[in-house]
Amino acid sequence: MALFKILLLLSFINICVGGEIAVYWGQNGDEGSLGDTCATNNYNIVNIGFLTVFGNGQTPVLNLAGHCDAASNQCSGLSDEIRACKSQGIKVLLSLGGAAGSYTLTSADDAKNVAQYLWDNFLGGQSPSRPLGDESLDGIDFDIEAGGGEFYDELAKALSEFGQKVYLSAAPQCPFPDQRLQGAINTGLFDYVWVQFYNNPPCQYSGDATNLLNSWNNDWSTIPTGKLFLGLPASPEAAGSGFIPADVLTSQILPAITATLKYGGVMLWSKFYDNGYSASIKPAV
């Protein structure tokens, strides 16, 4: 009975606090600036994507599409925008990987080297060549969609050992367990896990919410994470499949998951495709 009361209280607290909205920014020059993205007041977390090359001794490459060219030091001006976002209470993370890139980790030492690079160049460390300028980011997002899944657990561990809080997030595909990120997620070090419930018919919304809710409740709710997010495309054009109309999301799906203990909110791909979707769902998130 005591355990039941505790669980009930935690559910009540979760409902009262409400969820958050995370969004990916950086892959389309027409999506507006980072500062403008934060100024919409629609997002609590912004993932800057992507660091598309890293590991295996490669020189890391930051790809921000049409926004700026990091290779010629044109992205350091984003530091002021990052600072402005953080001043509004918005967490800003750097996303590793993405759907296209050349990235892999070949050993535990390789993972530690990548962690040190991230710390020195994007987090609380020091480097003469910080691609986004001097303002430190809040954390690192793992959007690993290519290569193998080895040693990402070691990367998560190394990022957690710098003596300063580094928020960690992961963006696995919804088929469970994720073939590349499950080992890292199982470390229990991730603050946020935003599962991509799209482009995967067996566990996405396809006119019916059954598969999605079964995946959420039976699979993903069992993982060791602080907060679990529902990852969705922000428009029908944002993904091949899995878009959920805002009215369906707010009336059928969010009421079924917001009371679950690990519910954290909704993640959207991406800012470019978000033409009012986040604003329309925000009151229900």
Show the residue positions of the predicted features:
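Chitinase-like catalytic core of GlcNAc-active glycosidases
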Residues: 17-252, 257-263, 272-285
